[in-house]
Design a protein with these regions (language model features):
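Mature, Sec-exported extracytoplasmic domains of Gram-positive
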Residues: 1-296
């Protein structure tokens, strides 16, 4: 592309929905044109569902082995519904990643990921949990423990913040299944009512929503430690930003019986190239909440 020569390539990306995406890329004069087609297997035949095209506004092959490109694509079906195009941010791994690394990512990192939590954003450990937000962790871990979403939802009236009192045993049974933390420490990191033995819980409100584009962590190395824990080294890949290494971090996990796991620590690896976590919106502080809702 840098030489502005003419070339073309076709790339197939398997979809988790049961079909695949076909990218026909053509470059000439320094520009890259993309034709994007989605195919679905139906009634014994492969059927093309959607086709769209765009000129890539961003294009890069990264040191981490990713082909990343983005642009605004148009299709007849989409235009009928929205009268506009849709942004697409594509990250295709070209260099193969060891299957062991992929499995470690699927097993330990993907279940937490980056949506509405700061577990892989801040430094913390079992000795000092730092700024790890246990209310966000409760939201994420509750379905894994109980098989359904937590019943503590936001108020229908956006001007009112719902406040719940969760029984001590209920709150701790979720958190302590994935963290080696005692009651006293957990209470110091939350709002705890010692008289009623409950944890105060406020679901995320309108001011705490996030733009629904998130990165993912990809294991690129690991060490099995003598104490039975595993140290995972991972890169944060953010297709929306066209960045295959927003930053690198180390996550220590403790595998337990029956496929269970405890999360031991997270550490951001310092680098001048680290990029800030633009996707994350933290929960309101107590002062911010009081200012917005007047303590109601």
């Amino acid at each position: 592309m840098d030489a502005q020569e003419e070339a073309e390539i076709t790339i197939l990306e398997i979809s988790y929905l049961g079909g695949f995406v076909k990218y026909d890329l053509h470059t000439k004069g320094g520009n890259v044109d993309v034709v994007r087609s989605y195919y679905k297997y139906e009634n014994g035949n492969m059927k093309r569902e959607v086709i769209g095209n765009y000129q890539a506004e961003y294009w890069n092959y990264t040191e981490e082995g990713y082909l990343m490109f983005s642009g605004v694509w148009f299709s007849v079906e989409l235009y009928v519904l929205t009268l506009s195009g849709a942004e697409e941010h594509t990250a295709l791994r070209v260099q193969p990643l060891d299957e062991t690394y992929r499995e470690l990512s699927r097993k330990y990192l993907n279940p937490i990921s980056f949506e509405r939590n700061n577990m892989f954003i801040v430094d913390w450990s079992e000795e000092d949990f730092g700024d790890l937000n246990f209310y966000d962790m409760y939201d994420i871990l509750y379905p894994k423990v109980n098989g359904q979403y937590a019943p503590y939802v936001a108020d229908d009236n956006l001007s009112v913040s719902a406040v719940y009192q969760i029984p001590k045993e209920e709150f701790e049974s979720v958190i302590m299944k994935y963290f080696n933390i005692d009651s006293e420490t957990l209470q110091s990191k939350t709002i705890y009512d010692s008289e009623n033995l409950t944890y105060e819980y406020k679901p995320r409100g309108f001011e705490e929503v996030e733009y629904p584009e998130y990165p993912y962590s990809e294991v690129v190395g690991f060490t099995e430690n003598n104490d039975g824990t595993i140290t995972l080294t991972a890169n944060v890949v953010f297709p929306y930003a066209g960045d295959s290494k927003v930053y690198a971090h180390e996550v220590v996990v403790r595998p337990l019986e029956n496929g269970r796991v405890q999360y031991v620590s997270n550490r951001i690896i310092p680098s001048e190239d680290n990029y800030r976590e633009t996707w994350h919106t933290p929960r309101l502080t107590l002062e911010e909440w009081e200012e917005l809702y007047g303590g109601e």
